[in-house]
Amino acid sequence: MKLMEVSPLFPCIFLRRVNRFVGLVRIKERIERALITNTGRLNEFMIPGRIGYCTPKAGGKTRYILLGFEDHGKIAIIDTRLQGKAFEKIIEKELLPELEGCRIIKREPRVGESRLDYLLECSKGEIFVETKSAVLREGEYAMYPDCPSVRGQRHIKELIKLARDGKRAMIVFIGALPNVSKFKPYKKGDPKIAELLKEALEAGVEIRALGLHMELSGEIIYRGELGVEI
């Protein structure tokens, strides 16, 4: 199902990652600095010469945002902001049964020592939701994380505490890759997160994974829920 469309969208050639947030790309024979919002290592994508896709941005030290990379004839979305916008469309269109009838009442609610992504109001009460970008591929699996994440550990701990306090809590993994049908944690990336997800499941945290990708035309396509293996 089409969720939204990105325009304008420019193909580019990825040259190198300058730092955590900036990459060099070639667009129409010009070398440009592009914003990278995903703080994962993304080693399977950040390969010199790989075809990426950018959109212009206003202001700042970068003129473009690196949204994704060509993958199996489509686009894997690495941009976490775009993933977030797509997730909000899924909520708005009531495409995730567990969140039917819900609406966002607060973004980045403070919980303990962290800020989670969303607080939603639903017919059966409120729910705290944290989203994570799962763009590491292993066969038909989308995986998270691709490197140690203290922040990710902290977020899962906060969700566990919420669930144990009787509140509804959910973590949603955004498998923004074409041709994946399942999600699992990448234990080599961060063994502690894999352990915490098992603890979260036992504590009552709802764990979901969603499949989406971008077409070369810029259309964001939602493919439904992915199977979850914790």
Swiss-Prot record:
GO MF entry, a single one: DNA binding
Pfam families registered for this protein in UniProt: SfsA, SfsA_N
InterPro entries for this protein: SfsA (IPR005224), SfsA_C (IPR040452), SfsA_N (IPR041465)
Parts forming coiled coils: none
Superkingdom of source: Archaea
Family the entry assigns: Belongs to the SfsA family.
NCBIfam families, A to Z: sfsA (TIGR00230)
Protein name per the record: Sugar fermentation stimulation protein homolog
Originating species: Pyrococcus furiosus (strain ATCC 43587 / DSM 3638 / JCM 8422 / Vc1)
Primary gene name: sfsA
